[in-house]
Amino acid sequence: MSCCGGKCGCGSSCSCGSGCGGCGMYPDLSYSEMTTTETLIVGVAPQKTYFEGSEMGVAAENGCKCGSDCKCDPCTCK
């Protein structure tokens, strides 16, 4: 999955590009409002726990992703 139609890359000083608003690429996953819905499915089979959205990976452009400190990882990506 590419954020902002592929317009999110690494800008100057190894910080994330402005195409996606820096670290705010996923407004619903901001640090101050991060929530997880937990669903327990219990039946005759062994109990398993599933977390909503757990299958979502980290968006990356050309092998580069926005790190937790709003810096590109790795810093050499363009």
From Swiss-Prot:
Pfam families: Metallothio_2 (PF01439). Keywords: Metal-binding, Metal-thiolate cluster. GO terms for molecular function: metal ion binding. The keyword Metal-binding applies. InterPro entries: Metalthion_15p. Metallothioneins have a high content of cysteine residues that bind various heavy metals. Belongs to the metallothionein superfamily. Type 15 family. This is Metallothionein-like protein type 2.
